[in-house]
């Protein structure tokens, strides 16, 4: 296993560990999801580049665009939550309590 793949796998596991340990604030969970998505994106780009040599470049751009859309949607949800509940705590997100 190359050191490059080891770094990508460690980033992925750091993202999972961050989600498990930082479940209090929504912003930290979103940052950990971004770390997961970026590590998967780098792994997919590396695998496709080794396999197809630039033929699948458009798929990488689509995945990167979708990750940017996911980040903006998560940030807008966090802003809406913090405006209505005055905090970004995950415990205040339970809709059934209202």
Curated annotation (Swiss-Prot):
Pfam families listed in its UniProt record: Oxidored_q2
Reactions mediated catalytically: a ubiquinone + NADH + 5 H(+)(in) = a ubiquinol + NAD(+) + 4 H(+)(out)
Phylogenetic placement of the source organism: Eukaryota, Metazoa, Echinodermata, Eleutherozoa, Asterozoa
Membrane-crossing residue ranges in chain numbering: 1-21, 24-44, 61-81
Topology in the lipid bilayer: Multi-pass membrane protein
Cellular compartments annotated: Mitochondrion membrane
Function, in words: Core subunit of the mitochondrial membrane respiratory chain NADH dehydrogenase (Complex I) that is believed to belong to the minimal assembly required for catalysis. Complex I functions in the transfer of electrons from NADH to the respiratory chain. The immediate electron acceptor for the enzyme is believed to be ubiquinone.
A GO biological process held by the record: ATP synthesis coupled electron transport
UniProt key word Lyase: no
E.C. designation(s): 7.1.1.2
The organism of origin for this protein: Pisaster ochraceus
Entry's family note: Belongs to the complex I subunit 4L family.
GO cellular component: mitochondrial membrane; NADH dehydrogenase complex
Domain of life: Eukaryota
Keyword check for Membrane: yes
InterPro entries per the UniProt record, alphabetical: NADH_UbQ_OxRdtase_chain4L/K, NUOK/Mnh_C1-like
GO MF entries: NADH dehydrogenase (ubiquinone) activity
Protein name: NADH-ubiquinone oxidoreductase chain 4L
EC primary class: translocase
Keyword annotations from UniProtKB, A to Z: Electron transport, Membrane, Mitochondrion, NAD, Respiratory chain, Translocase, Transmembrane, Transmembrane helix, Transport, Ubiquinone
């Amino acid at each position: 296993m190359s050191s490059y793949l080891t770094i990508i796998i460690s980033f992925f596991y750091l993202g999972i560990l961050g989600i498990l340990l930082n479940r209090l604030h929504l912003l930290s969970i979103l940052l950990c999801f971004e770390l997961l998505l970026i590590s998967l994106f780098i792994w997919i780009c590396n695998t496709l580049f080794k396999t197809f040599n630039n033929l699948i470049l458009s798929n990488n751009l689509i995945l990167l665009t979708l990750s940017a859309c996911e980040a903006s949607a998560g940030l807008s949800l966090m802003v809406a939550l913090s405006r209505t509940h005055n905090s970004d705590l995950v415990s205040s997100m339970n809709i059934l309590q209202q």
